[in-house]
Amino acid sequence: MSCCDLAAAGQLGKASIMASDCEPALNQAEGRNPTLERYLGALREAKNDSEQFAALLLVTKAVKAGDIDAKTRRRIFDAVGFTFPNRLLTTKEAPDGCPDHVLRALGVALLACFCSDPELAAHPQVLNKIPILSTFLTARGDPDDAARRSMIDDTYQCLTAVAGTPRGPRHLIAGGTVSALCQAYLGHGYGFDQALALLVGLLAAAETQCWKEAEPDLLAVLRGLSEDFQKAEDASKFELCQLLPLFLPPTTVPPECYRDLQAGLARILGSKLSSWQRNPALKLAARLAHACGSDWIPAGSSGSKFLALLVNLACVEVRLALEETGTEVKEDVVTACYALMELGIQECTRCEQSLLKEPQKVQLVSVMKEAIGAVIHYLLQVGSEKQKEPFVFASVRILGAWLAEETSSLRKEVCQLLPFLVRYAKTLYEEAEEANDLSQQVANLAISPTTPGPTWPGDALRLLLPGWCHLTVEDGPREILIKEGAPSLLCKYFLQQWELTSPGHDTSVLPDSVEIGLQTCCHIFLNLVVTAPGLIKRDACFTSLMNTLMTSLPALVQQQGRLLLAANVATLGLLMARLLSTSPALQGTPASRGFFAAAILFLSQSHVARATPGSDQAVLALSPEYEGIWADLQELWFLGMQAFTGCVPLLPWLAPAALRSRWPQELLQLLGSVSPNSVKPEMVAAYQGVLVELARANRLCREAMRLQAGEETASHYRMAALEQCLSEP
């Protein structure tokens, strides 16, 4: 059979591509095409390659393009099977005068015909061809060769059909298809547009796996698309706006793409546009803000103007969408605008290296205040039937980001919304799995049609904690929160989150958000201890909280890198112990003794004596572990010292326990070994408070202090109260 005959046989694949499953079947049981049936019989009975080729030619003549329905394709497959196409794809020897790619083209055409059937597209015999099919996309050859072009089209037909099966994307990724598609697109050869379309589909279906298998190639495509975006002057720039979010990596966008992406967006957003042109640009900017913060925006005047433009546009969109009741909300666009507003909040509150100048910050705070007012207006209209919708979650998130930094403005509106926020947080807390699913839906809604990199927190309560921390200081909002049951909810939440730090969990991979959430809860409880002590005494949830603090602190203070959390737990527990001192749990039980021993450890290890060159006397200095975080720690430490001092007269067993720990003796020894001039007055006051109460509470403590030169040390540091106490019998 000649090479021309082989090429003609390849027309079977052409017919298959043009065929449609929806067209009426040609071969119903009572009216099959007799000629086609005869040729299919010949195909089934063929004894060698030549007879099979001849039969294929006859079949293509009997079946006109577009006439092959699903049943006919299946009967052709039953007649041909996979063996013959397999041989065509792998043959090394072609007939004289026939290019070897013509045989492969016929093999691919047959596969393309078969892949029109979804069952066959998922067949192992098709799946194991993925690696060889992928190589055809990047094979060198004459770009004008019709047979080669036909083979490339058929290859894309096969791969696209496989991608449409349930497990197809996974097989394509494992078979090297993503890299091949990237190279085919970057080569801009025949069919490169089909490569891009298939890449988009695979990224949408399995983004993480795609990046894991082909990150360098995908980054090369991103660089190419970014350059095209920056240069585009026609409508293609709007198409690229929709494509680019799909090609941003789940971790960090390469810095070399920043300039092109920002320049392209600045050109689009700085023009007068319709909403269909502007919205994809806002969504791309939101994805970049979510992945990179403000790193992709250049410093200087142009960058600050661009950032201000982004935030202003976002605020306008939010107000237009949410202020008018009954208006259909483009939730994906508004959620993207929320991400840009959050970027604006971060930059407005940044003290160092902010992109914004002070007048710009003032202007943006004003427009964001108006947009947040629209968000509050929207949330006040939300009924219980909508509480589980992703857009509501996104709206609560941006409100939480605002309240974390600003609670003085919109106070009336915020107080009006607080009951809803408490109920909403409680609903999602009680249905944690649905809340986690909501976070993913919000991320998908906000950033792109595919799964984004960093996911947003999965519980509404964590989003609201910083704002509630500020609000519990104020009388009005605090009363509303207490009335709505927020303290009880916070206690339950704290206990649930604390379980993640228990020995049964791998705390080395504990998300930072969990620890930050626990610390913020502690700050809220500290506010309540100071401003609403009666609540602590009467609400049973705080008794449970106290028990958890007591049992947890001993292990926590021993863990590396968790000193700040330990400080929060110790200080909160000491302050609560003063209010709950009559509780049976605090009457010298093993748990209470363990807690106070751990609290003493935290308080006693903060400072050390440090030698100074050229001086005989050491100075009081922070211990290495405390030094790096003392700015965040010192307020808790001083508050903890004060709270411990207050506990001593309330708990008779505490002074003997402190004596057994040798803290008072070691404290006096430390003060005696350093220069008094190196000890700040506030430190002297804190140390004297503890020593005086211990001395007053227990005779053995007084004797131990005298033996440690306590009176002399008190005199050196002008601790009059301690000196007087130690001079008494």
UniProtKB/Swiss-Prot annotation:
Task: Provide the lipid-modification sites (S-palmitoyl cysteine).
Answer: 3-4
Report whether Cell cycle shows up as a keyword of the record.
Answer: no
Name any Gene Ontology BP term.
regulation of neuronal synaptic plasticity
Q: Name one GO cellular component term.
A: perikaryon
* Keywords, comma-separated and alphabetical: Acetylation, Cell projection, Cytoplasm, Disease variant, Endosome, Epilepsy, Intellectual disability, Lipoprotein, Membrane, Methylation, Palmitate, Phosphoprotein, Synapse
> Per the annotation, which location comes first and is thus the protein's main one?
cytoplasm
Report the subcellular localization: Cytoplasm, Cytosol; Endosome membrane; Cell projection, Dendrite; Postsynapse
Cite the record's tissue specificity text.
Answer: Abundantly expressed in whole adult brain and in all individual brain regions examined, including spinal cord. Weakly expressed in ovary, testis, fetal brain and small intestine.
Q: How is it modified after translation?
A: Palmitoylated. Palmitoylation by ZDHHC1, ZDHHC3 and ZDHHC11 regulates the association of NCDN with endosome membranes. May also be palmitoylated by ZDHHC7.
Q: Which residues cross the membrane?
A: none
Q: Give, from the UniProt record, the effect of changing residue 392 to E.
A: In a colorectal cancer sample; somatic mutation
Instruction: Give the disulfide map.
Output: none
Per the record, residues carrying Phosphoserine are 2, 448
List modified residues, type N-acetylserine. 2
Give the modified residues of type Asymmetric dimethylarginine. Answer: 75
Q: Topology relative to the membrane, per the entry? A: Lipid-anchor
What single Pfam family name could you report for this chain, choosing any that match?
Neurochondrin
Q: What does this protein do?
A: Probably involved in signal transduction in the nervous system, via increasing cell surface localization of GRM5/mGluR5 and positively regulating its signaling. Required for the spatial learning process. Acts as a negative regulator of Ca(2+)-calmodulin-dependent protein kinase 2 (CaMK2) phosphorylation. May play a role in modulating melanin-concentrating hormone-mediated functions via its interaction with MCHR1 that interferes with G protein-coupled signal transduction. May be involved in bone metabolism. May also be involved in neurite outgrowth.
Q: Could you say which disease the record links this protein to?
A: Neurodevelopmental disorder with infantile epileptic spasms: An autosomal dominant neurodevelopmental disorder characterized by onset of severe and frequent epileptic spasms within the first year of life. Affected individuals have global developmental delay with delayed walking and poor or absent speech. More variable features may include poor overall growth, high-arched palate, and delayed myelination on brain imaging.
Family, per the entry? Belongs to the neurochondrin family.
Assembly information from the UniProt record: Interacts with MCHR1. Interacts with SEMA4C. Interacts with DIAPH1 (via FH3 domain). Interacts with GRM5.
**What is the name attached to this protein's record?**
Neurochondrin
Question: What gene does this protein come from?
Answer: NCDN
